[in-house]
């Protein structure tokens, strides 16, 4: 995960009166986020107070750094950035963080809820949204996924749950509550939703094609985007229950259906933010496993077959 940040945003971050939160955000970055200074090193006015603060922070920041050394050079042309910026990004770019100094345009992009992006003054709040500690809780204590899922932008949702379609009664009682909770941020911005489940574990009374269309309608209504897509994949290659999104992974010890599902007391759920290197690597590994399912199991895939993180055959 990269953080692309303008010089003005660094000065704003360092000038924040919330020193404790600023220190927490600095630790967050050091533990797993690659920093891309969206300007040349020669652009820093070393004779100014702000320039001195930046260089001093940089020296302290690089001590004990767990990621690559910060990189310099313009990655994003902030002055000419447009509101369609999220759609122009690569798959990796859709999982990065952006702090850029163009408030008018950035606010419009931020409102779309597709990527983590902020303008001048947003630095602490945006980075703090990825400080997700002590999130492991008993699944039975979660009243609804909407209360538990953090408010983080998303373009893609990949749910792997062997028993998602196993019981028609349980399936209908839960009404795709997890998907709805994950789609709460996008606003007029499409979401690609993929559900991977176990072949042979689908209730015979469920019509998969019909259920796909129902879910697609739900996601389009929530996101406000007619370009939202849904894909169902069935496989005998089982995996742990994980949900991978742009910025975090949701791990659960049992089926994601919370209602009427006889959850055991020792079943837990936990959010693993990609701001942590290990968590990001595990999500990448899972994506590689899901890609193998697509490559080896083309006949058991229905729907739009669209994703920013997985590649479907033409």
Cite the ranges covered by each PLM segment:
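Secondary-structure "cap/kink" motif recognition
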Residues: 150-156
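Structural motif
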Residues: 156-158, 248
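Domain-level signal for Mg2+-assisted phosphodiester chemistry and nucleotide/NA-binding surfaces
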Residues: 162-179
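Short glycine-centered, acidic/aromatic-flanked micro-motifs in structured strand/loop junctions
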Residues: 159-162, 197
């Amino acid at each position: 995960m990269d953080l692309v940040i303008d010089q003005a945003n660094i000065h704003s971050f360092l000038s924040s009166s919330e020193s404790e939160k600023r220190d927490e955000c600095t630790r967050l970055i050091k533990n797993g986020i690659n920093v891309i200074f969206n300007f040349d090193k020669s652009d820093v006015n070393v004779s100014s107070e702000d320039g001195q603060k930046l260089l001093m922070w940089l020296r302290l920041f690089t001590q004990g750094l767990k990621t690559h050394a910060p990189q310099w050079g313009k990655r994003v042309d902030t002055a000419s950035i447009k509101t369609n910026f999220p759609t122009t990004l690569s798959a990796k770019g859709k999982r990065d963080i952006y702090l850029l100094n163009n408030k008018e345009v950035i606010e419009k992009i931020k409102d779309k809820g597709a990527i983590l992006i902020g303008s001048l003054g947003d630095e602490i709040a945006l980075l703090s949204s990825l400080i997700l500690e002590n999130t492991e809780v008993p699944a039975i204590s979660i009243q609804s996924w909407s209360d538990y899922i953090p408010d983080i932008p998303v373009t893609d949702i990949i749910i792997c749950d062997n028993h998602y379609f196993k019981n028609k009664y349980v399936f209908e009682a839960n009404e795709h509550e997890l998907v709805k909770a994950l789609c709460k941020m996008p606003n007029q911005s499409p979401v690609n939703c993929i559900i991977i489940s176990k072949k042979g574990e689908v209730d015979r009374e469920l019509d998969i094609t019909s259920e796909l269309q129902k879910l697609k309608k739900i996601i389009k209504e929530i996101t406000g985007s007619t370009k939202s897509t849904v894909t169902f994949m069935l496989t005998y290659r089982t995996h742990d229950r994980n949900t991978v999104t742009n910025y975090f992974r949701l791990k659960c010890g049992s089926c994601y259906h919370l209602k009427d599902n006889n959850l055991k007391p020792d079943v837990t759920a936990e959010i693993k933010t990609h701001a942590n290197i290990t968590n990001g690597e595990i999500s990448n590994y899972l994506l590689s496993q899901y890609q193998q399912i697509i490559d080896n199991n083309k006949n058991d895939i229905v729907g739009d077959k669209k994703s920013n993180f997985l590649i479907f055959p033409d």
